[in-house]
Amino acid sequence: MPVVSFSRREMERLWRSLSEEELTDLLDFTKMNLESFGEEVGFEVTSDRMDLVTLEGIVRCLKGISNEELGLPKYRVRRKAFEVRVGEGVAKVRPYVVAALVRDVDLRTEESLVALIEAQEKIHDTLGRKRRRVAIGLHDFSKVKPPIIYDARRAEEVHFVPLGEYAEMSAKEILEQTEKGKIYSHLIANPENLVPLIMDSREEVLSMPPIINSELTRLTPGVRDIFIDVTGTDLKAIWYALEIISSALAERGGEISTLDILYPDGRNIETPRHEPEEMEVDLDFIRSILGLNLSEDDVVMQLLRARLDAECSDGKVRVLIPGYRSDFLHPIDVAEEVSITLGLNKIGYELPKNVMTVGRPHPVEKVSRKVRTVMIGLGYQEVLNYIMTSRASLFHAVGREEREVVEISNPVSESYSVLRDALFPGLLAFLANNTHVRYPQKVFEIGDVVLIDERLENKTRDERRVAAAYADDSVGFEDIYSHLKVLFENLSYRIELEPRKERPFIEGRCASVLREGEEVGVIGEIDPEVLLNLGITVPVAIFEVALKVPGKEPLT
């Protein structure tokens, strides 16, 4: 879980002085733990509460728990200060941007700026997936002339002074010579050598996301007006990050100005969102989940202490949720919030009655452990991907033919809208994200896929599989087959291969894997065209096999 630390003096300036014991007692009613207490105060926060990686978010939360401020924070908001115009050039490089302006912020101390940068970098590393998914730019607005332009230019044609430098450099030089450029340049690598840029109306470069800001808009203590840009590959994620940062600055007295983001396809969105979302939950549901006969007033008070707005009538609890909270997906989350602010120690427990069982590993788990040991022995590194993914990632990105898969009826994000029916697309995505790492690269995953099966009552079944991908400049079918053969020999099974024609494999270099005459998987070399589309410049061979075949026992 993320750990953040801030100046205790700055925390006291934002709120009040607390002893270590007082702070620990307050944190018992939050999703935070105290990691350290001295000149710096360290907090461990849960990954679903990214608003708590900001010092301002922590103070906002503690004010609620101590009953000093209840309900939704009231921020000053001015709508549509100016436009951010998105060019067509960024579509294939870094397609999404949102932005805000926050005026009259109190950032008079060095510690306040350090706290802001600490939160920014923690969001980059977690929610932002090391800046791939989300990158935040913070700028001194007094140096900016709106409207703002977000577009791409050829790297050799762009020149500006990068943050922390004294001389003008080309974007190409920044990517090749600066520390940040060397670390993050792979995130915007593309055949056209384009770089995304945040510019003002004079075409002065403010930022080259996700690499580095310009020295022109450096933040210094005493800065009053801050322009925030957030770019990335996931619109929902960057919107969430903007809500976190803009609300944190509003906690320092700032006035949030929303901006119009004009996309080239005609979309016009206003950011940040200044209206809370609403969720309605049955009061009896909360009572049953917590096992407590709470009154309407009890439930409403706990939600107000959680810095939410709430009211209850006719057995329904109506909750208003601010934009910087993305952890409310289901009524169970409202019940959880009540339990946290109420105090988990107030919820009793009892041991199950008449339960006399002896546990043992499931056969599929036993074989999974054995497979893991063999794969590690073959020099492979294990990766873990989500079972939820998108159609684009599962089919389009890796050149697979579309087929019927289990879809989520109301997905929170397009990135998690279907259940995977194969493991290897996730491995290819992993390789595509790590082209900057030295080869050979050998990765594997053991996990479940979900398949349509009309014979079953629920029309689906889970299947445990292992998939492996081997990437190197001279890797071929024979290399990956030798590893598959070793794996099955260690499982005391013989396998046979049968020619197969299927995308995204090279024709003639793909086969079905048969165990006792029944197909259990696939092996082959990936089509170079698919690899190039993913940005992978070396050959890749993969296999994927089931560890449990319907009607047969697990491989043991």
UniProtKB/Swiss-Prot annotation:
<dbReference type="InterPro" id="IPR041616">
    <property type="entry name" value="PheRS_beta_core"/>
</dbReference>
<comment type="subunit">
    <text>Tetramer of two alpha and two beta subunits.</text>
</comment>
<dbReference type="InterPro" id="IPR020825">
    <property type="entry name" value="Phe-tRNA_synthase-like_B3/B4"/>
</dbReference>
<keyword id="KW-0648">Protein biosynthesis</keyword>
<feature type="binding site">
    <location>
        <position position="327"/>
    </location>
    <ligand>
        <name>Mg(2+)</name>
    </ligand>
</feature>
<dbReference type="GO" id="GO:0004826">
    <property type="term" value="F:phenylalanine-tRNA ligase activity"/>
</dbReference>
<keyword id="KW-0547">Nucleotide-binding</keyword>
<protein>
    <recommendedName>
        <fullName>Phenylalanine--tRNA ligase beta subunit</fullName>
        <ecNumber>6.1.1.20</ecNumber>
    </recommendedName>
</protein>
<keyword id="KW-0479">Metal-binding</keyword>
<feature type="binding site">
    <location>
        <position position="336"/>
    </location>
    <ligand>
        <name>Mg(2+)</name>
    </ligand>
</feature>
<dbReference type="InterPro" id="IPR004531">
    <property type="entry name" value="Phe-tRNA-synth_IIc_bsu_arc_euk"/>
</dbReference>
<keyword id="KW-0436">Ligase</keyword>
<feature type="binding site">
    <location>
        <position position="337"/>
    </location>
    <ligand>
        <name>Mg(2+)</name>
    </ligand>
</feature>
<dbReference type="GO" id="GO:0005524">
    <property type="term" value="F:ATP binding"/>
</dbReference>
<keyword id="KW-0460">Magnesium</keyword>
<keyword id="KW-0067">ATP-binding</keyword>
<feature type="binding site">
    <location>
        <position position="333"/>
    </location>
    <ligand>
        <name>Mg(2+)</name>
    </ligand>
</feature>
<dbReference type="InterPro" id="IPR005146">
    <property type="entry name" value="B3/B4_tRNA-bd"/>
</dbReference>
<dbReference type="GO" id="GO:0000287">
    <property type="term" value="F:magnesium ion binding"/>
</dbReference>
<dbReference type="InterPro" id="IPR022918">
    <property type="entry name" value="Phe_tRNA_ligase_beta2_arc"/>
</dbReference>
<feature type="domain" description="B5">
    <location>
        <begin position="274"/>
        <end position="349"/>
    </location>
</feature>
<dbReference type="InterPro" id="IPR045864">
    <property type="entry name" value="aa-tRNA-synth_II/BPL/LPL"/>
</dbReference>
<dbReference type="InterPro" id="IPR005147">
    <property type="entry name" value="tRNA_synthase_B5-dom"/>
</dbReference>
<dbReference type="GO" id="GO:0003723">
    <property type="term" value="F:RNA binding"/>
</dbReference>
<dbReference type="GO" id="GO:0006432">
    <property type="term" value="P:phenylalanyl-tRNA aminoacylation"/>
</dbReference>
<dbReference type="Pfam" id="PF17759">
    <property type="entry name" value="tRNA_synthFbeta"/>
</dbReference>
<dbReference type="InterPro" id="IPR009061">
    <property type="entry name" value="DNA-bd_dom_put_sf"/>
</dbReference>
<dbReference type="GO" id="GO:0009328">
    <property type="term" value="C:phenylalanine-tRNA ligase complex"/>
</dbReference>
<comment type="similarity">
    <text>Belongs to the phenylalanyl-tRNA synthetase beta subunit family. Type 2 subfamily.</text>
</comment>
<dbReference type="InterPro" id="IPR045060">
    <property type="entry name" value="Phe-tRNA-ligase_IIc_bsu"/>
</dbReference>
<keyword id="KW-0963">Cytoplasm</keyword>
<keyword id="KW-0030">Aminoacyl-tRNA synthetase</keyword>
<dbReference type="Pfam" id="PF03484">
    <property type="entry name" value="B5"/>
</dbReference>
